[in-house]
Amino acid sequence: MNVLVINGYCLSVNSSANLCHLAYLQGFVDAGAHVSLLSIDPADYPTDLSMKIPDKIDCQYIRAISLYERLSRFKKGISSADEQNTEGTIAASSRSPHGLLQSIKNRIRTLYGPYGIDKAFYQKCKRFSCSKSFDLVISISHPPVSHLAAYMFLKTSRIKAKHWIQIWEDPWYSDVYGFNSQERVRLEEKRLLSLAEKVCYVSPLTLLNQQKLFPESAEKMFWMPLPAYYKNATPVHKTSGRNIYGYFGDYAPAARDLEPFYTAADKAGVEVNICGNPSNLFHSTDKIHIHPRLPLVELRPIENGTNVLVFLCNRQGGQIPGKIYQYSATEKTILFILDGTDDEQAVLKDYFGKFNRYVFCQNTVEDITRAIRQIESGDIGSVRNMPLDDFEPAKIVTSILEAGR
């Protein structure tokens, strides 16, 4: 099978979304497909050498850095120069180079429409064509412009393919942060969905919500878990006989409420590493260590020294942070903190509970404290700290192909 994967982002940038993108690519390779990738050229972006595209993939890159991004980098250069000459000056006004550039940037951003600066990928893709025929095109968002580019290619026959599946790791209009709740975004998402042959989401709750929001496309929608990117689980061990807890991921209050866990962990006196942004919401203590988002090469030693992984659900929206699938591939204890409405929590616990893999609790100080005590005592009932193979990339990709027929 010849598969073309389209993603309008630089896959060498360190992000949770990119780790999932790479896992999809690995899944297609492991499933025996001949995989081609069309993505953004890493030459224009800060890359993490640990973010490696799987071997055996034919990579085609688009130079798609936007004018907005170029001006942002130029502005940073001016700001750095200003910092060296601030003595005896006043704040920059709109007539300064800094203020003028910001004004130009704001005007330019409005020209990109609902896609924002990601629209540059679509614009540059208009120059691309491929003589190879594909059995399947997979467009993956984030960002949603991946789907727009895929449609343009297929409509104009710049790319020939038998089938097309859209994978939405996050919905657009109803994203968990609420940044895209504009009518023009809803209408464009509706249009993109109407163009697709099949649409795959990564959460049962997101599927239900999207089917209600876009009933005209409901029949073509299905859901499938994200593939796990961990390949070799690190050995589990206790340092000096104690557990070390780890929360790895962002925790902006609009999306995730980490404060109950922080408070419960502090009161319980357990050792914790929290790695992610924003890193200024909580202060470090003797046992709780706060870190910003780290490159993988710096994050790995901390992850390897952790034997209790903390997973926190989103406040609302039904989206499932992809880390739960990655953690499930390890032999480590997983503290699964439920959040959202009662109905959302019930759906998540019903699905994940069948694996007997997680120690569940609600996102309150009291219930998290109970779960921590349970873990510390070693009394976790029928929970088995064994790797699940249900989320292996090849299995997930095969299931997507079967559901997409």
What kind of region is each of these model predictions?
Residues Y229-N232, K238-H283, R293-L296:
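Conserved catalytic-core segment of nucleotide-activated headgroup transferases in glycan assembly
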Residues M1-Y68, K198, E259-A268:
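N-terminal subdomain of nucleotide-sugar transferases
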Residues H163, S194-T234:
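Donor nucleotide-sugar binding/catalytic pocket of nucleotide-sugar-dependent glycosyltransferases
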Residues L49-S50, E69-L71, Y177-N180, F222-R242:
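Acidic anion/phosphate-binding donor-loop and adjacent secondary structure
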Residues A43-G116, A120:
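A conserved catalytic-core segment of Leloir-type glycosyltransferases
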Residues A252-R256, V297, P301, L309-S328, ...:
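Nucleotide-sugar-dependent
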Residues V359-G404:
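A charged, aromatic-enriched C-terminal amphipathic alpha-helix characteristic of glycosyltransferases
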Residues A23, R127, V145-L148, Q166, ...:
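Membrane-proximal helix-turn-helix segments that form the acceptor-binding/catalytic region
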